[in-house]
């Protein structure tokens, strides 16, 4: 297919127009007084949001060269979202500022490669300053502050800090849509997996339709159990001990299942059977997790163990087990804390090494189930449109909170970036590299400038006042006052601020060094074909 090619200034200007189209759509959402953007959806109601990456993902431009610029800045937002989970609007604003200032200098005759080197050195210096001045996050109040600033809602901040307190920093916190109007937190203690009882005859509480086993033994195997003879020896030992039993197996069917139900109905013996969670290798790993948590052994031929030779000390134990139609929860397993700790460390290592997002998510779920539990934030709202908008804000706040726990917090409201610009004074560079540093220095003011503009203030005046104030003193757009940002609870995660700058500078520096754009020539056949079709319809009308 034939291509169209543009060079030099024409190419860079086309990219800049695309960058501006996307960035202008996103930057209006920045800060506590930022506005929302409405995104049209082909199916269902439009989506109202102030989430930078969600807006960026929707933008496609008609002109192929302008679209290249928009897609490059979209990469800044998505990469920041992947790494830090928040700060996507800040990253977009920074990228636009670096590109705008950089292109001015390139047009004036500066060497783009020299500017690129200067930008890289400046970013390195600023990132070092952010890391040095980051404060570790310890208290529940600090966690609530980070979440509140990200979500723009104090109630959400409290909800997330409660969730983190209950399940720990390694715990899983999921966000779901609720059926009612209230947003609430539900915490699942212990290990839960999505497999329920194999027969309703196994329930012990008919009102709640669930089976509750107190201080039971747990038989864990990866085999199918069909014949009662396979498990009879261990059943007899459990009955003699006067205890209840939970069986977790690949499947239990036929004679074995019928016998267990019959004994339950006669009141001889209480046993609940559930299928093993997961599939394939993941199932084996989850069964091992359950065994370690409960102090049992997985009866598997991989270890040379057979069901008929199972002894009572191979069974796991727990304080209580709750089994519903859909899920099983093991509360307070009797496993050794040292074994659980070792298993947690092994899973953490796997999380660091894996390259698959899906595997990482599943490993984090396993880690949470071993380390603390799972918290579910159920998002309620009056309408579906409001619920989706709220859910996006909570997901961002959650990501920001995790980032804060990881690398600490810095002054919020764009203040940390303005303060970090002072670190650039120590860089003694010359020529175009010095210009690159000046470009970054100007770009670092842009988030604060935009927050002030969105709040109805003159950005340049606000930036000047903050620059001349002490470190950590910034502009609170909500109260319209200048104050110590950390003391006022206006904080950003250091990881979010750092990632936003690094990703913005990376894409912007590459874009400045662009000299040529190549794209397919847009096809004109589609319009001609449509016109021909219309003519045919007219001919048919004459025949009627």
Curated annotation (Swiss-Prot):
EC number per UniProt: 5.6.1.7
What Gene3D superfamilies does the record point to? GroEL, GroEL-like equatorial domain, TCP-1-like chaperonin intermediate domain
Q: Which PANTHER family match?
A: 60 KDA HEAT SHOCK PROTEIN, MITOCHONDRIAL (PTHR45633)
Family designation: Belongs to the chaperonin (HSP60) family.
Where along this sequence does the record place binding of ATP?
Answer: 29-32, 86-90, 413, 476-478, 492
Q: Name one GO molecular function term.
A: ATP-dependent protein folding chaperone
Q: Name one GO cellular component term.
A: cytoplasm
Could you tell me where this protein is found in the cell?
A: Cytoplasm
SUPFAM superfamilies from the entry?
GroEL apical domain-like, GroEL equatorial domain-like, GroEL-intermediate domain like
Q: Which Pfam families match?
A: Cpn60_TCP1
Q: What is this protein called?
A: Chaperonin GroEL
Q: InterPro entries in the record, alphabetically? A: Chaperonin_Cpn60_CS, Cpn60/GroEL, Cpn60/GroEL/TCP-1, GroEL-like_apical_dom_sf, GROEL-like_equatorial_sf, TCP-1-like_intermed_sf
Root EC class: isomerase
Q: How does it assemble?
A: Forms a cylinder of 14 subunits composed of two heptameric rings stacked back-to-back. Interacts with the co-chaperonin GroES.
Q: Provide the alphabetized UniProt keywords.
A: ATP-binding, Chaperone, Cytoplasm, Isomerase, Nucleotide-binding
Chemical reaction(s) catalysed: ATP + H2O + a folded polypeptide = ADP + phosphate + an unfolded polypeptide
> What job does this protein perform?
Together with its co-chaperonin GroES, plays an essential role in assisting protein folding. The GroEL-GroES system forms a nano-cage that allows encapsulation of the non-native substrate proteins and provides a physical environment optimized to promote and accelerate protein folding.
Q: A single GO BP annotation from the record?
A: protein refolding
């Amino acid at each position: 297919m034939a291509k169209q090619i543009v060079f030099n200034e024409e190419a860079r200007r086309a990219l800049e127009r695309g960058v501006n189209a996307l960035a202008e759509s996103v930057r209006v959402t920045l800060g506590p007084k930022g506005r929302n953007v409405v995104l049209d959806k082909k199916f269902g109601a439009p989506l109202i949001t102030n989430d930078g990456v969600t807006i960026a993902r929707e933008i496609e431009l008609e002109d192929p060269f302008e679209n290249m610029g928009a897609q490059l800045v979209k990469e800044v937002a998505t990469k920041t979202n992947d790494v830090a989970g928040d700060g996507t609007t800040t990253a977009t604003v920074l990228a636009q500022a670096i590109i705008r200032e950089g292109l001015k200098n390139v047009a004036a005759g500066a060497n783009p490669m020299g500017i690129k080197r200067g930008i890289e050195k400046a970013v390195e210096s600023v990132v070092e300053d952010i890391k040095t001045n980051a404060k570790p996050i310890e208290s529940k109040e600090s966690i609530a502050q980070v979440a509140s600033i990200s979500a723009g809602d104090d109630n959400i901040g409290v909800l997330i800090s409660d969730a983190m307190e209950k399940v720990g920093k390694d715990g899983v916190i999921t966000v779901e849509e609720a059926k009612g109007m209230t947003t609430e937190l539900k915490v699942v203690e212990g290990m839960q997996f999505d497999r329920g009882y194999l027969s309703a005859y196994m329930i012990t509480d008919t009102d709640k339709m669930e089976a509750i086993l107190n201080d039971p033994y747990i038989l864990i195997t990866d085999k199918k159990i069909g014949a009662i003879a396979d498990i009879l020896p261990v059943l007899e030992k459990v009955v003699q001990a006067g205890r209840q039993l939970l069986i977790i197996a690949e499947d239990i069917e036929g004679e074995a299942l019928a016998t267990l139900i019959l004994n339950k109905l006669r009141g001889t013996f209480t046993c609940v059977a559930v299928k093993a969670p997961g599939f394939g290798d993941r199932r084996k790993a989850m069964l091992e997790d359950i065994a370690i948590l409960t102090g049992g052994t997985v009866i598997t031929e991989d270890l040379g163990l057979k069901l008929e030779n199972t002894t009572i000390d191979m069974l796991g134990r727990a304080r209580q087990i709750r089994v519903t139609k859909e899920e099983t929860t093991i509360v307070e397993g009797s496993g050794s804390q040292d074994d659980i700790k070792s298993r947690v460390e092994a899973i953490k290592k796997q999380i660091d090494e894996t390259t698959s997002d899906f595997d990482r998510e599943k490993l984090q779920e396993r880690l949470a189930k071993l380390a603390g539990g799972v918290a579910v934030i159920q998002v309620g709202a009056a309408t579906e449109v409001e619920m989706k908008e709220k859910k996006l804000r909570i997901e961002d706040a959650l990501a920001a909170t995790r980032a804060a726990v990881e690398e600490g917090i810095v002054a919020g409201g764009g203040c940390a970036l303005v303060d970090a610009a002072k670190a650039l004074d120590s860089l003694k560079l010359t020529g175009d590299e010095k210009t690159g540093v000046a470009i970054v220095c100007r770009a670092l003011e842009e988030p604060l400038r935009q927050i002030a503009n969105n709040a109805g203030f003159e950005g340049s005046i606000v930036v000047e006042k903050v620059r001349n104030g002490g470190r950590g003193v910034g502009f609170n757009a909500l109260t319209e006052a200048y104050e110590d940002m950390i003391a006022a609870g206006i904080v950003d995660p250091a990881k979010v601020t750092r990632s936003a700058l690094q990703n913005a500078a990376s894409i912007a520096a590459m874009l400045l060094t662009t000299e040529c754009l190549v794209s397919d020539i847009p096809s004109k056949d589609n319009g001609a074909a449509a016109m021909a079709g219309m003519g045919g319809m007219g001919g048919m009308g004459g025949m009627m």
